[in-house]
Amino acid sequence: MADEDLIFCLEGVDGGRCSRAGHNADSDTDSDDDEGYFICPITDDHMSNQNVSSKVQSYYSNLTKTECGSTGSPASSFHFKEAWKHAIEKAKHMPDPWAEFHLEDIATEHATRHRYNAVTGEWLKDEVLIKMASQPFGRGAMRECFRTKKLSNFLHAQQWKGASNYVAKRYIEPVDRSVYFEDVQLQMEAKLWGEDYNRHKPPKQVDIMQMCIIELKDRPGQPLFHLEHYIEGKYIKYNSNSGFVRDDNIRLTPQAFSHFTFERSGHQLIVVDIQGVGDLYTDPQIHTEKGTDFGDGNLGVRGMALFFYSHACNRICQSMGLTPFDLSPREQDAVNQSTRLLQSAKTILRGTEEKCGSPRIRTLSSSRPPLLLRLSENSGDENMSDVTFDSLPSSPSSATPHSQKLDHLHWPVFGDLDNMGPRDHDRMDNHRDSENSGDSGYPSEKRSDLDDPEPREHGHSNGNRRHESDEDSLGSSGRVCVETWNLLNPSRLHLPRPSAVALEVQRLNALDLGRKIGKSVLGKVHLAMVRYHEGGRFCEKDEEWDRESAIFHLEHAADLGELEAIVGLGLMYSQLPHHILADVSLKETEENKTKGFDYLLKAAEAGDRHSMILVARAFDTGLNLSPDRCQDWSEALHWYNTALETTDCDEGGEYDGIQDEPQYALLAREAEMLLTGGFGLDKNPQRSGDLYTQAAEAAMEAMKGRLANQYYEKAEEAWAQMEE
């Protein structure tokens, strides 16, 4: 059988059968990579071919109706078909940018390919054939890149001139092998968020390159390489994991995408370090709340703070219902300069963008909850975990294999698309567009924050090469019914959250205090902004750091339930020593005294022992008490008792093991108050004597024998008053 008979036969967009006349094997090979084509099985069975043809015609009939609308005119339908045909013909005649390097003459190597499915969390291995250049053509801060060709597993003959162009990347300095696998997991998790962004119908869709690992088992040590397609065009870094944005590279879509991931995930993560060609991105970084996933590039809430310090909400953010992050007036002035630069951006809104958090397009992952559910398991708010989002099938039949898995696990699956309305089909088409990724060939270091990208080698992607995006990474498959998931797992539901403090405060106010303190990631982001200001990160070396902005974010963090911020503001406003913003002092006014005591009282209610003692002393002595309150020994006794009983963690998850006052001193003060009475507290000599005895025992344990004897004497005096 001739080689060209072994190539997949395709059906064109007009439903006609493909003809081999006038087409060589390379042409046929090219066609089956276009995502608008249906791949048919190789068979000589005439009846089977007829069945396949009818399926293809039915599929493309539905596809055309979806794209053009059920009420669209035949003229618009014809225009859609012609556009696809024109794009395919153009792709076929693109030259190979690496032809001059004659990679086909290099020795063939056997490699084990590791592919990651971000939906199921599974790794699969298979064998591939590659040809890799011996010298790198690009070098970044941490990795170097090698030109590579990989033979498609779909081919039955080794046609290396028709093989796809790839880029193999390896770390310059030796790293643990697990780092390679973490990088792939990160990029494929980020790809899911790109697909979710596309389902909200933005003006321009985004896609993140698919990446896998190849293990060259015939080389010494069996080294690992990352493998990506070669990207066509100019490589640009739009933002980094430290929030850096080049003025001449400001675009709307990359910044809006990062902002979207923060709100859509309920503040549990943000995808940053956006770089690539156009809106085809590679080497992103994900910052998570805990900061423990995905290696050293994950800066946690600090990375989120860095992004929002330099982020100016644009018209895409507004059209998708994303809320601006709260900045101080001085910070806002700096961001407004970027806002003026955004006016030159050419992106035009269609007016059909979906609002972030639209329940109609929320989907769930299949067999194993992916990144977002793993993050939710570690989040402080057990009852407010987030819904995860699965990508749609990348082809009409791609849901089938995983559907069997899901049925096995009793997950409700849309095995077919019967329940999909016209708008759902639109999303499937949008997803198909987003999956049409190119080939990456540029070194991109997500861990080198502020370095400008080095000059890159440019070139056209090889149009007549198989993209093989379906085999280089395991895409998403299967969609789970959200309503059923909510019924089975109501505690896992987590709606998207806005970036605005006022709206987050409204959500927290509906919770009791025990679930309010330390449960807002947005509060942690504002607290990180405080630390960056205090550390001088946001100012020039010779400038004073912005104290007003630091206090602004500290107050917002306190409003959002961050215990450290609440305590810090309470001490600061009360003119007491404080560890956060230690160089900042505020005016001593009645208003500030009231604010300070209110913050300390809130911290005491949240379980902070130091604040309990300060509040008790204020009610006891009247010092540092707010002007609108008066001495109240019953309140003081309550807080002294609470401080004595506090031996577990506070609401912020911390335990203060360094006692501000020893236990015997607090017990003795309680006994003294009960012995004399006053300020709303009745005398109780018997209780006073008991407390003096407890104070004496505590003093003995602390090796304070002389003080213990004094307490025993006072206990006898108190009991003597009781007998009188």
UniProtKB/Swiss-Prot annotation:
It comes from Mus musculus. The lineage of its organism: Eukaryota, Metazoa, Chordata, Craniata, Vertebrata. This is Eukaryotic elongation factor 2 kinase. Residues 385-403 have a biased composition (Polar residues). PROSITE patterns: ALPHA_KINASE. GO terms for biological process: cellular response to anoxia; cellular response to brain-derived neurotrophic factor stimulus; cellular response to calcium ion; cellular response to cAMP; cellular response to insulin stimulus; negative regulation of apoptotic process; positive regulation of dendritic spine morphogenesis; positive regulation of endocytosis. ATP binds at G295, D296, G297, N298, L299, G300, V301. Autophosphorylated at multiple residues, Thr-347 being the major site. Phosphorylated by AMP-activated protein kinase AMPK at Ser-397 leading to EEF2K activation and protein synthesis inhibition. Phosphorylated by TRPM7 at Ser-77 resulting in improved protein stability, higher EE2F phosphorylated and subsequently reduced rate of protein synthesis. Phosphorylation by other kinases such as CDK1 and MAPK13 at Ser-358 or RPS6KA1 and RPS6KB1 at Ser-365 instead decrease EEF2K activity and promote protein synthesis. The modification N-acetylalanine is found at A2. Undergoes calcium/calmodulin-dependent intramolecular autophosphorylation, and this results in it becoming partially calcium/calmodulin-independent. Residues 80-93 are annotated as: Calmodulin-binding.
